[in-house]
């Protein structure tokens, strides 16, 4: 994709993510006052940070493909986790996610729990296709899922804020949820690697040509 069109695409994506964030705050704060502890919201915030950083590289006339590669790998896997875990739990038992009678707008729900992953997939496939980029360590996903599980348990015990009460009923359930989250992230990680094995994009070829001429 041409650099100018890439920059415009990134700005549109950022505006969309910010609008979803604002909508989520307006709709969900009365129902979930502490919903910024949820993986869904954390994923949204990290994506916003990523696109702010990547737009900065666009404005500095740098090739976004060569920057923040591990961060993009991480948010791709995290977005995949949010999508699979949410719809999976919703299919199994809606009561594990929502209290009886609670309603979230359908478009907002889909944007939060699938829309962000679709954006990340389009980013890799069409906007900034990365060929054999730098990847996150698989160990990172285990460490982060473990830290997150322990953190929400501590938050519940110290402040009585129940982020995922169904997941904290027993140590066995906590271990299962942590391990499932880890495996889902790893699956997303390898999907990203698979998508990265396609042929090089025009931007990468141009960048490599420039580097060759300079050197």
Regions found by a protein language model. Give the residues of each.
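Core segments of transmembrane alpha-helices
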Residues: 76-80, 84, 112-121
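Hydrophobic core of alpha-helical transmembrane segments in multi-pass integral membrane proteins
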Residues: 12-22, 146-153, 178-191
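Central hydrophobic cores of alpha-helical transmembrane segments
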Residues: 137-146
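Non-transmembrane, juxtamembrane loop and terminal tail segments
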Residues: 200-215
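N-terminal helical submodule of small eukaryotic multi-pass membrane proteins
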Residues: 1-86, 90
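Membrane-lumen (extracellular) interface motif
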Residues: 20-40, 59-68, 88-108, 125-138, ...
């Amino acid at each position: 994709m041409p650099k100018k069109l890439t920059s415009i695409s990134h700005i549109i994506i950022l505006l969309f993510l910010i609008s979803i964030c604002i909508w989520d705050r307006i709709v969900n704060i009365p129902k979930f006052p502490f919903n910024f502890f949820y993986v869904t919201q954390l994923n949204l915030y990290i994506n916003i940070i990523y696109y702010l950083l990547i737009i900065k590289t666009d404005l500095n006339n740098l090739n976004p493909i060569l920057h923040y590669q591990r961060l993009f790998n991480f948010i791709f896997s995290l977005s995949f986790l949010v999508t699979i875990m949410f719809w999976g739990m919703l299919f199994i038992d809606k009561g594990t996610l929502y209290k009886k009678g609670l309603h979230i707008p359908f478009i907002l729900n889909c944007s939060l729990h699938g829309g962000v992953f679709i954006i990340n997939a389009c980013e890799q496939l069409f906007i900034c296709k990365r060929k054999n980029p730098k990847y996150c360590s698989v160990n990172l996903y285990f460490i982060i899922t473990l830290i997150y599980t322990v953190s929400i348990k501590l938050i519940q015990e110290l402040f009585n804020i129940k982020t995922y009460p169904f997941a904290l009923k027993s140590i066995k359930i906590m271990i299962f949820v942590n391990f499932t989250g880890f495996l889902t992230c790893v699956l997303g990680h390898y999907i990203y690697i698979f998508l990265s094995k396609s042929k090089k994009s025009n931007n990468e070829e141009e960048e490599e040509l420039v580097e060759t001429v300079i050197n």
